[in-house]
Amino acid sequence: MINAFRGAIASLLFAPVAWSQSTLPTAAEVIAKIKGQAGIEMKPTTVDTFKAGDPSTRVTGIAVTMMATLNVLKAAVARGDNLIITHEPTFYSHRDTIAVLESENDKVLATKRKYISDRGLIVWRFHDIPHQMKPDIIRTGIVRALGWQSSFHAEDQEVFDIRRASVRALAKEIGEKLGARAVRISGDADAMVSRAVLTQGFPGFVANRHAIQRGSPDVVIIGEDHEWETIEYVVDAISAGQIKAMIVLGHIASEQLGMDEVARWLRPLLPGVRIDFIPTPDPFRFSR
């Protein structure tokens, strides 16, 4: 009886609410709704916090993005969105720490903060929660975009048995599907591969190494990493004949469409609030 009562209360608290134009939610109300729906216990060290703006501001629209660059902010303003939900930092460090840049009167920081302030934008980071969701909603979006839903191992969602293809063809296909303009290959680009380990963003050397050990892949696909850690490790594994090749996508491309998945997840939760997915362009391209 008590559990049933608690369940009823929870369903009322976190059920979709259609706001009218005159009673648009505040940014704080929107974020509370998101946290409640995700059901993830927040750690004191989480980076999923407001980074700029007044959370009591009423939301005219939500821009969901991989990275709140100045160009993305301008695109959000053009659409009439004032709440920016970004996966990655806004102010150039994991915790958006700005004290040093402020003390140096950094012009880039000042320009961005002024733009946010002048237009009444609110920026909230959505990084830890999506990766802790079951399944990881960022990974879900990438797997959907690649069409690999039936290819991953049930016991390890970083390991995929994929259609046999050359490394070159695989890199081209992934780049096109994920919007990566500067995909890099290490190893034999003409080698045929069918078992992949895919990690996203920047999980770090330990996580990448463990995924490789678990998956025993012939191709490793990553977002980014230090060249003296995962990159060097895989280069040595290629030299030793343990792996055929590595594909490096770039951080943004390796997670971007996961935020498109987030936008899809948010729309039924927040009816009456416009939600736009605004892609962050791959910052790199080849010089030739």
Spans of model-derived segments:
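Bacterial N-terminal signal peptides that target proteins for export
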Residues: 1-9
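N-terminal signal peptide c-region/cleavage motif recognized by signal peptidases
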Residues: 15-17
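Active-site catalytic microenvironments in core metabolic enzymes, especially phosphate/sugar-handling
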Residues: 20-288
